[in-house]
Amino acid sequence: MTWQTYLKDHQSRFVDELLDFVRIPSVSAKDEHFDDVVRAGHWVVERLTQAGIENVRLMETETHPVVYGDWLHAGSDKPTVLIYGHFDVQPAEPFELWESPPFEPVVIDDTVRGRGASDDKGGMLIPILAAEALLATEGKLPVNVKFFFEGQEEIGSPTLAPFIAENAKLLQADMIFSADGGQWDENQPNMIIGLKGLVGCEITVSGAKGDQHSGMQGGGIANPIPCAFTYHCLDERAGWENHG
């Protein structure tokens, strides 16, 4: 049996597993779902182990946990690839706008619909399935592989940097493949050359406290919102020419 045949023959099981994974409301932004994020991490541990990955473990950080596993038998002459993904998801509110409950996933037109089905539970599950298929049919992987999945990506990975620094040797690799992204079609991936971080801010503007009479004011009255936009466009560092 080839790995392609293996994937095809087990497709229905893989879909059921993704549905089971998406049912876990692992919303990292909400304290009430902390245990759910941990539960999702344990789900990943079990799934990696089932796939034949070794040294699999849930590792604590100062906030949400990470999951690590590896298969390092390709040989010292082969590169080591670290595969990254995340098992936490965004909040699903407002729930009333969903056609079906976000944590009760359904399959419609061959598409799994539920919170996190794409970002990133479906994405991170694919390399696990690929490794399982290769190990089941060929008994080996073409390269050494490390898996590193986190549970805090959707909140900006606030405690991931110190964890990585403390575990630099464990996570050392020749290249990193992110399973948190997209590709153009089944056979054509895309390459992302940069990612933006998160910015949170609060802007307070003030203007007239009530309606103004043109006869009393004798001219135009500045509206702070369009004025701010105009000033922004005049800024050569972030002006209109840089925004289309």
Sequence positions of predicted segments:
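Active-site metal-coordination/substrate-binding segment of hydrolases
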Residues: 78-149
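Acidic/histidine-rich catalytic neighborhood of metal-dependent amide-processing enzymes
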Residues: 118-194
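Flexible glycine/proline-rich, aromatic-decorated loop/lid segments
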Residues: 190-206
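Short small-residue beta-strand/loop micro-motif enriched in glycine and branched aliphatics
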Residues: 112-114, 209-215
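N-terminal helical capping/dimerization or prosegment-like subdomains
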Residues: 1-95
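Acidic-enriched catalytic cores of C-N bond-cleaving enzymes acting on peptides and small amides
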Residues: 184, 193, 214-244
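Generic secondary-structure signature for well-ordered alpha-helical cores
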Residues: 12, 23, 49-50, 136-139, ...
